[in-house]
């Protein structure tokens, strides 16, 4: 998520084992009051607020980055929640929706194609825009030679390296310069690596048949909680193992919700309780996810499922475009001298200038790329039908 998955997933059906309340009432004095609807019953992929939540989370990432990109720092005890919960929420939603995607259509080729089409085309175009438009504009604003930058190998090298997520190639010929956070044109790309690894994990689990049962999700989640707790220190120095534990744990929490969706009650009271747990854990624990990964996933997924208002059903998913274009636009704002603004004001300006790029990315790139999924699916199934038909024809006695 990367930031931005789940489009096109068929509606999740209600649990067929849930009896009608009148039938239960007729069974006699042993009846129990129903606990209310489950997540499976309230979640409708055609009418939900998950796209709204993802856009909110992407905007939260802009707010989070407005501190370091203006040369400021978020101080304890609010730093953990403020700097991590937004992306963690993305991964939790993704864990729920990606698991649903595999269960709905457990074909590896189509799964890989769908994930690649969601992430890569938008990313590649974004890299080209950064290298050949945003970076030269930034150089020109600072009095440098945009033509010299464009004639060098640096823009092409930036695109090629980051296109395969070699994200350590963060700058373009040393730019951006003379800003509070120099040398990095898009500081969110590294999270896409972990998103892709989570996609791979779902594919491996699906091929192995582990998504057909509930217990593997429980075992994996418990192991990740232990792993995440063990690598939580030192807190001030983020290691690769801490990153793995962080993203894998919240993604697994979303997947766990999917696997138990017909058992999990969907109530606003539990959403509120989950939010309180996330807040308390974020303020009191060095790694809030050890206690609050499931509450975070519950809060964002179930609240999104409970909201069925048509106006909050976004047909356009701008969250991915906002996510990948916001940092370079914030750097450009800093180059223009706006880093003196208070971070909240800086974030508002960044949202305003980023949304048009996100909209162009969705309508011109991402949406068109996603439309190819149906073509790939029809071709794959058409080829399978031809092979199957040929096998039947060539079988003696058929």
What does each of the following model-derived ranges do?
Residues 28, 32, 36, 86-118, ...:
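Juxtamembrane transmembrane-helix termini
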Residues 46-103, 120-123, 322-327:
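Functionally critical transmembrane alpha-helices in membrane proteins and complexes, commonly lining
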Residues 84, 124-196, 297-299:
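Membrane-interface helix-loop-helix regions
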Residues 196-224, 258-269:
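Solvent-exposed interhelical
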């Amino acid at each position: 998520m990367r930031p931005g998955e789940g489009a096109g997933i068929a509606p999740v059906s209600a649990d067929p084992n849930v009896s009608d309340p009148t039938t239960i009432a007729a069974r006699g004095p042993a009846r129990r009051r129903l606990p209310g609807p489950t997540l499976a019953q309230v979640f409708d992929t055609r009418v939900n607020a998950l796209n709204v939540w993802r856009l909110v989370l992407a905007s939260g990432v802009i707010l989070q980055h407005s501190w370091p990109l203006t040369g400021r720092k978020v101080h304890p005890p609010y730093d953990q929640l403020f700097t991590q919960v937004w992306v963690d929420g993305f991964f939790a939603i993704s864990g729920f929706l990606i698991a649903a995607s595999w269960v709905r259509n457990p074909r590896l080729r189509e799964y890989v194609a769908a994930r690649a089409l969601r992430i890569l085309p938008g990313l590649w175009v974004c890299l080209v825009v950064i290298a050949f438009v945003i970076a030269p504009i930034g150089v020109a604003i600072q009095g440098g030679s945009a033509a010299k930058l464009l004639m060098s190998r640096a823009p092409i090298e930036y695109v090629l390296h980051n296109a395969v997520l070699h994200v350590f190639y963060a700058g373009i010929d040393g730019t951006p310069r003379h800003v509070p956070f120099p040398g990095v044109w898009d500081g969110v790309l590294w999270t896409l690596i972990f998103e892709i690894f989570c996609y791979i994990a779902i594919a491996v689990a699906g091929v192995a048949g582990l998504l057909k049962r509930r217990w593997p999700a429980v075992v994996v989640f418990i192991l990740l909680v232990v792993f995440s707790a063990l690598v939580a220190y030192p807190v001030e120095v983020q290691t690769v193992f801490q990153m793995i534990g962080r993203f894998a744990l919240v993604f697994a929490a979303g997947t766990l919700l999917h696997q138990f969706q017909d058992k999990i009650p969907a109530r606003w009271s539990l959403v509120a309780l989950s939010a309180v747990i996330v807040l308390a854990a974020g303020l009191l624990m060095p790694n809030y996810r050890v206690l609050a990964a499931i509450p975070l996933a519950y809060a964002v997924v179930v609240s999104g499922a409970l909201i069925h208002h048509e106006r909050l059903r976004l047909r356009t998913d701008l969250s991915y475009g906002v996510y990948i274009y916001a940092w370079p636009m914030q750097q450009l704002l800093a180059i223009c001298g706006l880093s003196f603004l208070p971070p909240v004001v800086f974030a508002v300006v960044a949202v305003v200038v980023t949304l048009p790029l996100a909209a162009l990315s969705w309508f011109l790139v991402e949406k068109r790329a996603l439309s190819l999924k149906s073509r790939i699916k029809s071709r794959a199934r058409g080829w399978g039908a031809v092979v199957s038909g040929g096998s039947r024809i060539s079988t003696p006695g058929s």
